[in-house]
Amino acid sequence: MTHTYPVAEIFTSINGEGVLAGQLAVFVRFVGCNLRCSYCDTMWANAPDAPHRKMTAEQIAHEILDTGIHNVTLTGGEPLLQPHIHELLARLSEHPQLRMEIETNGSMDLSPYLDLPRITFTMDCKLPSSGMFEHMRTENFSLLRPCDTVKFVAGSRTDLDCAWNVTQEHQLLGRCHVYLSPVFGAIDPADMVEYMKERGWNGATLQLQMHKFIWDPNARGV
């Protein structure tokens, strides 16, 4: 049986954040999400009935390969909600030039995908202002590897306190990349720098969402 995936959009741009910020990537955005974060900037893609194309793994792979771009970011929505996502990842892994990044919201089990080559996770850890902190799957922290990233999107000092505590409790700085990002327009990045200085937060990286400064913050497909 050939499975299909609900794809909201496939586009090429630069990575706006994370370890590969500024590098070209092909983005594959799936519809549907199990969380409703207060600051979500892709709410339009969260509903299962959001506009989308039904695409097979072969069609998705073909469209990616046609771009000639090697970095591939699977995003959403929540890509790991797709019932047959392992099949798609395995198909993409057949191409050694592709490097896959899965942007996931922190509530989904990562363990089924650790056996696949050239796949990294950028896992959100939702903070109190998101309204979704209680949905975080803390078991995932022990699965993360040096190639993976935990991203904290903070909108307040309370959020930063929470991010600091999670980082210390789960010893994340010795395990994976740790990135801090402001909720766009909600907190002054300068205040985040001051907080990092107060804590002596070695090893964490503050990063702004580059694409929101290059293009309109609400623009799609960039």
Label for each model-derived stretch:
Residues 5, 9, 24-25, 36-118:
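Conserved Radical SAM active-site core
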Residues 61, 80-222:
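Conserved AdoMet/S-adenosylmethionine-binding subsite of the radical SAM
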Residues 22-27, 37, 43-45, 56, ...:
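General N-terminal targeting signals
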Residues 3-8, 12-15, 35, 39, ...:
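Amphipathic, alpha-helical segments enriched in basic
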Residues 27, 73, 149-151:
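Short aromatic/hydrophobic contact patches that present stacked aromatics
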Residues 1-31, 35-39, 43, 199-209, ...:
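Flexible, acidic/Gly-rich N-terminal and inter-domain linker regions that tether
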